[in-house]
């Protein structure tokens, strides 16, 4: 029963879409009507500016952290953290109050991975960041990150690995059109290194 309760707690907190709250409260708009129509960090940052993208990301990380800590202290057994993570992703990607139309779960999955196993989480996140810089793409690296993390955790605990693999599949589903765009050459390129250099005032040769 603990696994079910952990999943439900995660789902309830996952339903709090920071992008929608920020959009309605501060910008007086519906984020799903702009850009990629995705109520997530990337779309908020791309359409309304980095400040709102960062605020959205922080909000999503905070809701995830609260849910994970509740499960951590209430239900013994590390495996329950994985189920809370599954609930968070389900709630974030398929919120019941928004007709099951939510975000893609990148920030949430990163938070869950680091909370569950911070060493493996940070290591796979680093790989994803390097891939992002090399590929100049925001679609494939998050999926590679979650896949690598899932495989590693499967070696440690098969049940946890399967739960994280389900999370990976949910993300693949949410990213499906972006994946198609990437492999057909229509994916949006994001030069992270250029953005960092520009922010620091470093001129490219």
Swiss-Prot record:
EC code(s) of this entry: 2.3.1.275
Keyword field contains Lipid metabolism: yes
Cellular component, GO annotation: plasma membrane
Any GO MF annotation of the entry: acyl-phosphate glycerol-3-phosphate acyltransferase activity
Residue intervals passing through the bilayer: 7-27, 52-74, 78-100, 125-145, 160-180
InterPro entries with a match to the protein in the record: G3P_acylTferase_PlsY
Catalysed conversion reaction: an acyl phosphate + sn-glycerol 3-phosphate = a 1-acyl-sn-glycero-3-phosphate + phosphate
Keyword Transmembrane appears in the UniProt entry: yes
Main location: membrane
Pathway this chain belongs to: Lipid metabolism; phospholipid metabolism
Subcellular location field: Cell membrane
Domain of life: Bacteria
Membrane topology category: Multi-pass membrane protein
Keywords carried by this UniProt record: Cell membrane, Lipid biosynthesis, Lipid metabolism, Membrane, Phospholipid biosynthesis, Phospholipid metabolism, Transferase, Transmembrane, Transmembrane helix
GO term, biological process aspect, one: phospholipid biosynthetic process
Similarity annotation: Belongs to the PlsY family.
Stated role: Catalyzes the transfer of an acyl group from acyl-phosphate (acyl-PO(4)) to glycerol-3-phosphate (G3P) to form lysophosphatidic acid (LPA). This enzyme utilizes acyl-phosphate as fatty acyl donor, but not acyl-CoA or acyl-ACP.
Subunit comment: Probably interacts with PlsX.
PANTHER family per UniProt: GLYCEROL-3-PHOSPHATE ACYLTRANSFERASE-RELATED, INNER MEMBRANE PROTEIN YGIH
Name of the featured protein: Glycerol-3-phosphate acyltransferase 1
Species for this entry: Lactobacillus acidophilus (strain ATCC 700396 / NCK56 / N2 / NCFM)
Name of the coding gene: plsY1
């Amino acid at each position: 029963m603990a696994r079910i309760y952990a999943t439900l707690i995660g789902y309830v907190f996952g339903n709090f879409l920071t992008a929608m709250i920020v959009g309605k409260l501060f910008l007086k708009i519906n984020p799903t009507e702009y850009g990629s129509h995705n109520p997530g960090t990337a779309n908020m940052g791309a359409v309304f500016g980095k400040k709102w993208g960062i605020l959205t990301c922080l909000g999503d990380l905070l809701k995830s952290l609260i849910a994970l800590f509740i499960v951590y202290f209430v239900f013994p057994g590390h495996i329950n953290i994985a189920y809370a993570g599954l609930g968070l992703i389900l709630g974030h990607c398929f919120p019941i109050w928004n007709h099951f139309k939510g975000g893609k779960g990148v920030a949430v999955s990163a938070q869950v991975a680091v909370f569950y196993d911070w060493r493996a989480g940070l290591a796979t996140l680093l790989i994803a960041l390097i891939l992002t810089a090399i590929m100049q793409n925001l679609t494939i690296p998050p999926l590679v990150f979650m896949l690598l993390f899932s495989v590693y955790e499967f070696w440690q605990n098969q049940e946890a690995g399967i739960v994280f693999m389900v999370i990976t599949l949910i993300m693949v589903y949410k990213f499906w059109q972006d994946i198609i765009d990437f492999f057909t050459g229509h994916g949006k390129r994001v030069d992270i290194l250029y953005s960092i250099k520009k922010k620091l005032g470093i001129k490219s040769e």
